[in-house]
Regions:
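Short aromatic-enriched loop/helix-cap "lid" or pocket-rim segments at secondary-structure transitions
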Residues: 37, 44-47, 136-138, 187-190, ...
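C-terminal substrate-binding subdomain of Rossmann-fold SDR/epimerase-dehydratase oxidoreductases
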Residues: 23-30, 34, 63, 194, ...
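Residue-level signature of the cytosolic catalytic core of signaling kinases
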Residues: 54, 136, 185-189, 247, ...
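N-terminal Rossmann-like NAD(P)+-binding domain of SDR-like oxidoreductases, especially those catalyzing
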Residues: 1-182
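Residues in well-ordered alpha-helical elements
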Residues: 69-72, 91, 98, 109, ...
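Heptad-repeat alpha-helical coiled-coil signaling segments
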Residues: 110, 181, 187, 213-215
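Hydrophobic alpha-helix immediately C-terminal to the catalytic Tyr-X-X-X-Lys motif of short-chain
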Residues: 158, 162, 166, 196, ...
Length: 301
């Protein structure tokens, strides 16, 4: 796909992956409209950290996915939609599950309907590897069963199925990308790698939840390239595409690796309040990299 001059809407643009995607699209000379959630501070989230020359080339619009009028206005005259906006954070989904359904399912429905009525070249919907639950087999391919092991995962499964239904029912050119765990600059301090690094540098020990879960970790710029390749590939329409490396590491191994790189002999301790409920824990997520992604290039490295 030729991105120069392409009119692109990015929801969730003020978030971690979204801000990197916006930055990359600007570098490719796309005409980027960034949807951010309204706040009284006129704060663009992580877009505020982009270079000034990049920010000057972004059209920022404030709105709310749960308002259908807001999604309609945001999508006007756009060719491509990258839908990344969602309520994330598994712990809070145990506290406010209805809010997760309202935003992740209801908000996605509003955007899909606006895209259907206005017509877009491509709608890239963002899922999550959490929809797989604990792996029934590894590596996990796109046909792996989906399991709602948390209200967050359940809300994303619902959103994924809505996206699928709009492809099958209305021929909306949807592709669903399912990133595994992504890391890199601008990531939330609550994420596992920043959490370990911060404690390794400042604490007397490194306190974590369970050390056993294994995750497939992908650098954020690679994840962004996966988004762009999925949007550009016609064979990806109607498909779910995993974005992962095919390698996993346990949280304990990850902490030991970071401590070795930083230096020091700090103890790694587990704290129960950091753990998920046992039946809600996802013990292993490791992506298959030889599935449908081969037809359109997959991750760059």
């Amino acid at each position: 796909m030729q991105w120069k001059g392409k009119r692109v809407l990015v929801t969730g643009s003020g978030g971690f992956i979204g801000s990197h995607l916006v930055e990359r699209l600007v570098a490719l000379e796309a005409r980027v409209r960034a949807l951010v959630r309204y706040n009284s501070r006129n704060d663009w989230g992580l877009l505020e950290l982009l270079p000034q020359e990049s920010k000057a080339r972004i059209e920022v619009v404030a709105g709310d996915l749960t308002d259908p009028f807001s999604t309609w206005r945001a999508l006007q005259d756009c060719d491509v939609v990258f839908h990344l906006a969602a309520l994330i954070g598994i712990p809070y989904s145990y506290v406010a599950p209805a809010h997760y359904v309202q935003v992740n399912c209801g908000g996605t429905l509003n955007l899909l309907e606006a895209a259907r009525q206005q017509g877009v070249e491509c709608f890239v919907h963002t899922s999550t590897s959490e929809t797989y639950g604990t792996a029934q087999y590894t590596p996990i391919d796109e046909s792996h069963p989906l399991t709602g092991q948390s209200p967050y995962a359940a809300s994303k499964i619902g959103a994924d199925k809505l996206a699928e239904s709009y492809y099958l029912s209305f021929q909306l050119p949807v592709v669903t990308v399912r990133p595994f765990n992504t890391f890199g600059p601008r990531q939330s301090a609550r994420a596992i790698i920043p959490t370990i690094i911060t404690q390794a540098l400042t604490g007397e020990s490194v306190s974590l939840g369970s050390l056993e879960p294994r995750r497939d970790l992908t650098y954020v710029t690679d994840t962004v390239e996966g988004f762009l390749k999925a949007a550009a590939a016609a064979p990806a329409r109607g498909q779910v595409i995993n974005l992962g490396t095919g390698q996993s590491i346990s949280m304990g191994e990850l902490a030991e690796m970071i401590l070795k790189l930083i230096g020091g002999n700090k103890e790694i301790v587990t704290e129960r309040h950091r753990m998920r409920p046992e039946t809600s824990e996802v013990w292993i997520l490791e992506s298959e990299t030889a599935g449908p992604g081969r037809s359109w290039g997959g991750l760059p490295r």
